[in-house]
Amino acid sequence: MKRVLTALAATLPFAANAADAISGAVERQPTNWQAIIMFLIFVVFTLGITYWASKRVRSRSDYYTAGGNITGFQNGLAIAGDYMSAASFLGISALVFTSGYDGLIYSLGFLVGWPIILFLIAERLRNLGRYTFADVASYRLKQGPIRILSACGSLVVVALYLIAQMVGAGKLIELLFGLNYHIAVVLVGVLMMMYVLFGGMLATTWVQIIKAVLLLFGASFMAFMVMKHVGFSFNNLFSEAMAVHPKGVDIMKPGGLVKDPISALSLGLGLMFGTAGLPHILMRFFTVSDAREARKSVFYATGFMGYFYILTFIIGFGAIMLVGANPEYKDAAGHLIGGNNMAAVHLANAVGGNLFLGFISAVAFATILAVVAGLTLAGASAVSHDLYANVFKKGATEREELRVSKITVLILGVIAIILGVLFENQNIAFMVGLAFAIAASCNFPIILLSMYWSKLTTRGAMMGGWLGLITAVVLMILGPTIWVQILGHEKAIFPYEYPALFSITVAFLGIWFFSATDNSAEGARERELFRAQFIRSQTGFGVEQGRAH
């Protein structure tokens, strides 16, 4: 019987070489009632939270940033919930299951961006901005052009990420719950719209917090049971895994995932700087009251995520022992049922039985809902706040801006559902990779240099930002993933899978060159305004504080 060829590697950033890409058909599995019941409990509970949140959303600040009343600890959990996708859980544990130590190296790529956010971005971002990162980028530059560029960068990242999440959700739910793919995509889209439409950032935050707690609990239990099996000895864990894995001792060696040093460097830079340019992550720093709480947010988030990625390493090696060596989880051809991405799900069954399998399946679904809700709110705020209220209709009232935001949520939700259905059998692995590359090549350079480089001008930011965005897209199209695997050409024009090294370089050089050669009076004025911006970014004087409801 033909099983799943893929589950969720496509939602893993730069997952072209991760376990499997999403492509081809998935055969529906028998209906998993335990998983469905647990998921329904989660949905009912979170819809209750959305109703509670809707009664407290009275203003633009409430809708975009939960009134700035989220604590650093709560925001840290929510950031972790926003960032730890189902692909992190299933994809990285699958990488460890197939490649061993390389999976740990890959997971570190998700973490290395957070020290940059902590030391370079979080505090100044909170002190300078209100609702979106474009508030920061345009603080002393021309509002119109910079907000259009920032909004375009945000919307492209959100759209690519959203499509990948929707397709991944449909495939995953079809596999785990036995539901029809189209029903699954519509269900995710409708729930996503309800959370954001009625509850805004407050509901989205609590959905992300609940999801993070459930995911951390589930992963902790699995890791505990694996370590209990080996007498809480890492030496026994690795020895037993090496004894049963087809690659033997080679699973403890690095270097099998990335072909050459250029690809490795480009992948690392994309993951590192892409994280610091994701609009739905940056938006979370405006939900706390001040810069101190923003720093706390990153501290807690990094701790939760670091702990989680250590757990995925243990889970991956546990799957090698308890799943890979067990014929119950193999099909007639000797392959893992459902593909390698199902390693963690099968391990849940192995250590906790059917009930825990249902719990982990429901958590995987909840994980996708939390991520798409954050993405949708980031996309809606880019349209309503950056474009509508600050470019096309300056001076718009809060009521008008919120109305546009909610209309955008509906449009984004409908588009996400339609594209999720259209891309059902397409290889969309490149989409999240491209999203990270664009975030690293367009959003990150502008955010960083607008806060730290006194000589930045609007001309430099515009030219460098657009060059970075276009370079990332063009190189991705000309690279092996799209040019060869999707378009069917014999040889790629651009030889590397990951464009970030080149597109980031183009962006920074473009910003530097066009700013340095800008001798206009407007450019001189923008340079003079840096001192006032610097004082605000350091002291927070004049920043909008959180307030009680």
From Swiss-Prot:
Topology of the protein relative to the lipid bilayer: Multi-pass membrane protein
Keywords annotated in UniProt: Cell inner membrane, Cell membrane, Ion transport, Membrane, Sodium, Sodium transport, Symport, Transmembrane, Transmembrane helix, Transport
Any one GO molecular-function label of the UniProt entry: glycolate transmembrane transporter activity
Pfam families per record: SSF
Membrane-spanning parts: 33-55, 76-98, 103-125, 146-168, 183-205, 212-234, 261-283, 303-325, 359-381, 402-424, 428-450, 462-484, 494-516
Localisation: Cell inner membrane
Periplasmic compartment spans: 1-32, 99-102, 169-182, 235-260, 326-358, 425-427, 485-493
Cytoplasmic domain ranges by topology: 56-75, 126-145, 206-211, 284-302, 382-401, 451-461, 517-549
Gene Ontology CC terms, in alphabetical order: plasma membrane
InterPro entries: Cation/Ac_symporter_ActP, Na/Glc_symporter_sf, Na/solute_symporter, Na/solute_symporter_CS, Sodium:Solute_Symporter
PANTHER family per UniProt: CATION_ACETATE SYMPORTER ACTP (PTHR48086:SF6), SODIUM/PROLINE SYMPORTER-RELATED (PTHR48086)
Similarity comment text for this entry: Belongs to the sodium:solute symporter (SSF) (TC 2.A.21) family.
Function: Transports acetate. Also able to transport glycolate.
Subunit structure: Has been isolated from inner membrane preparations as a homodimer.
Protein name as annotated: Cation/acetate symporter ActP
Gene: actP
